[in-house]
């Protein structure tokens, strides 16, 4: 997998967390960089671990599905991408009126981080069928997420109403394109 594809997957995996961070930043009275960085680290670590878990699950099943692994990667990335696009296009439900101080709790951040990283676990399953170093991919996904969450919280006040959903749509489109590229390359023998 090319370095550009690895970076694009890292970016795509961080868009859910970025959208959540914008929402958290928008709910805070005045986000402080230290709190934003702390949230970024929590999200980044979780987002880096989940594709490794998915990769391990995928490797365990590899011998049984090698003949159609490209279809699995395409299906997982495509389905996740379409789901992200759908979530980005659907109208928001009623906004919760939460106490902004609750956005800083470790367990609340960790739970949100895990919820936004489920797609990274599924991508990890797909990566098990490809020639990619999972350690490098996990670090890239974690660093992209750390950066996107930190920036998202700090910009949340300003960007909350403008960017939140678009980030998820862009991430979804990227996943669909990468999935289609994997399928195309396999079917046409492109290395």
Swiss-Prot record:
GO terms for cellular component: plasma membrane. It is a multi-pass membrane protein. InterPro entries: Mntp/YtaF (IPR003810), Put_MntP (IPR022929). Its main location: membrane. It is found in: Cell inner membrane. The keyword Glycosyltransferase does not apply. The keyword Lipid metabolism does not apply. One of its GO terms (molecular function) is manganese ion transmembrane transporter activity. Keywords: Cell inner membrane, Cell membrane, Ion transport, Manganese, Membrane, Transmembrane, Transmembrane helix, Transport. Signal peptide: none annotated. The chain crosses the membrane at residues 3-23, 37-57, 65-85, 107-129, 144-164, 169-189. Belongs to the MntP (TC 9.B.29) family. Probably functions as a manganese efflux pump. This is Putative manganese efflux pump MntP. It comes from Stenotrophomonas maltophilia (strain R551-3).
């Amino acid at each position: 997998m090319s370095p550009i594809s690895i970076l694009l997957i890292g970016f795509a995996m961080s868009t859910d967390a970025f959208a959540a961070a914008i929402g958290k930043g928008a709910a805070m009275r005045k986000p402080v960089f230290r709190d934003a960085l702390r949230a970024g680290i929590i999200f980044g670590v979780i987002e880096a671990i989940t594709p490794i878990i998915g990769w391990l699950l995928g490797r365990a099943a590899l011998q049984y599905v090698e003949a159609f692994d490209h279809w699995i990667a395409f299906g997982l990335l495509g389905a996740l991408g379409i789901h992200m696009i759908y979530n980005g296009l659907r109208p928001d439900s009623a906004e919760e009126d939460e106490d902004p101080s609750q956005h800083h709790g470790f367990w609340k951040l960790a739970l949100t981080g895990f919820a936004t990283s489920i797609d990274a676990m599924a991508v990890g399953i797909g990566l098990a069928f490809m020639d990619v170093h999972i350690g490098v991919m996990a670090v890239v996904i974690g660093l992209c997420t750390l950066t996107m969450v930190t920036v998202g919280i700090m910009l949340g006040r300003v960007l909350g109403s403008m960017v939140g959903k678009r980030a998820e749509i862009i991430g979804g489109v990227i996943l669909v394109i990468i999935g289609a590229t994997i399928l195309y390359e396999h079917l046409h023998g492109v290395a």
